[in-house]
From Swiss-Prot:
InterPro entries according to UniProt: Carboh/pur_kinase_PfkB_CS, PfkB_dom, Ribo/fructo_kinase, Ribokinase-like
Cofactor: Mg(2+)
Keyword Kinase: yes
Family under the similarity heading: Belongs to the carbohydrate kinase PfkB family.
Keywords recorded for this protein, A-Z: ATP-binding, Carbohydrate metabolism, Kinase, Magnesium, Nucleotide-binding, Transferase
Pfam families documented for this protein: PfkB
EC primary class: transferase
Catalytic residue list: 242
GO biological process: phosphate-containing compound metabolic process
Protein name as annotated: ATP-dependent ribose-1-phosphate kinase
Lineage of source species: Archaea, Methanobacteriati, Methanobacteriota, Stenosarchaea group, Halobacteria
Catalysed reaction equations from the record: alpha-D-ribose 1-phosphate + ATP = alpha-D-ribose 1,5-bisphosphate + ADP + H(+)
Length: 296
């Protein structure tokens, strides 16, 4: 079985279904409330486990009740938590996700002890023994150290820096990544508003660009592919991008077929958007059934 480590944030999410996302001085009605695990790295790890990948996690939580809930949720998903640091007297990051009727999301939250793992806390042995490492938003020095260790060991690296890409210096981790994930806004920051893959600093590796309900595209040194996505009724888009990344990684590591990985990733993202909660990625059987219904 393929072994993948995800590194980055581990959150506890409170999802509030609202009638609309309020503007400044506005108000919205809460229709329902639920709690679940969250955090991009944790979401990817849980999604990979659901896709029958041996998934581990590098991150940190507090020793509070939310940390217990976050770890319990990941353990039940089948994620190896050996690399998760428990910070004494620390507060686990909590995110409040406001989700409107169209499934669009706004996020409020605190980082808590999310970035307590520094380069000196990394277990290099676990990285060297992995088949792949997936980086998400985290301390730039930690991301760089993990990527550097993986590169030295011949372990492939993917990176989804997320919304903080323009605010933090991820240069070393970006340079070390074999696969990059970004949405349209992040791509603009990545390519400095040029939107051109060829001739950019990243045209020697795989770049997957997520377009939400409009699907995604992937660029490689040997060609580009576009997938229009799947038509689903979006309920909650939180975690859909993480499910996309997990689906792409799981498929690409299995057979190296980038076009097939793009299709599979879109299916994972669509199925996640059709369900509530950031931790709602599908199982391998669910993805297989979804694709079979559309192409058989």
């Amino acid at each position: 079985m393929v072994r993948v480590l995800s590194a980055g944030h581990v959150n506890w999410d409170v999802t509030l279904r609202v009638d609309r996302l309020p503007e400044a001085d506005g108000e919205a009605s809460i229709r329902s409330q639920r709690q679940s695990g969250g955090g991009s790295a944790a979401n990817v790890a849980a999604a990979l486990a659901g896709l029958e990948v041996d998934a581990g996690l590098i991150g940190s939580v507090g020793d509070d009740d939310n940390g217990v809930l976050a770890r319990r949720d990941l353990e039940s998903a089948g994620v190896d938590l050996e690399g998760v640091r428990i910070v004494e007297a620390g507060q686990t990051a909590v995110k409040y996700l406001l989700v409107d009727d169209d499934g669009e999301v706004a996020v409020l939250g605190n980082d808590g002890v999310n970035e307590a793992v520094g380069p000196e806390e990394i277990d290099e042995r676990r990285i060297r023994n992995a088949d792949h490492v997936h980086l998400t938003s985290q301390r730039p020095d930690t991301a760089a150290a993990i990527a550097r260790t993986a590169n030295e060991a011949g372990v492939t690296v993917s990176f989804d820096p997320g919304r903080r890409l323009g605010d933090r210096d991820y240069g070393e981790a970006l340079a070390a990544a074999d696969v990059l994930f970004a949405n349209d806004r992040e791509l603009a920051a990545l390519l400095e508003d040029e939107y051109e893959y060829v001739g950019s600093d990243f045209d020697d590796r795989i770049v997957a660009v997520k377009h939400g309900s409009d699907g995604a595209e992937v660029h490689t040194p040997t060609g580009s592919y576009v997938h229009p996505g799947f038509d689903v009724d979006a309920v909650d888009t939180a975690g859909a991008g993480d499910a996309f990344a997990a689906g792409f990684i799981a498929t690409w590591l299995t057979d190296g077929d980038v076009e097939r990985a793009l299709e599979y990733a879109n299916a994972c993202g669509a199925l996640t958007a059709g369900r509530e909660g950031a931790r709602s990625a599908p199982t391998a059987d669910a993805v297989a059934a979804f694709l079979s219904e559309r192409f058989d």
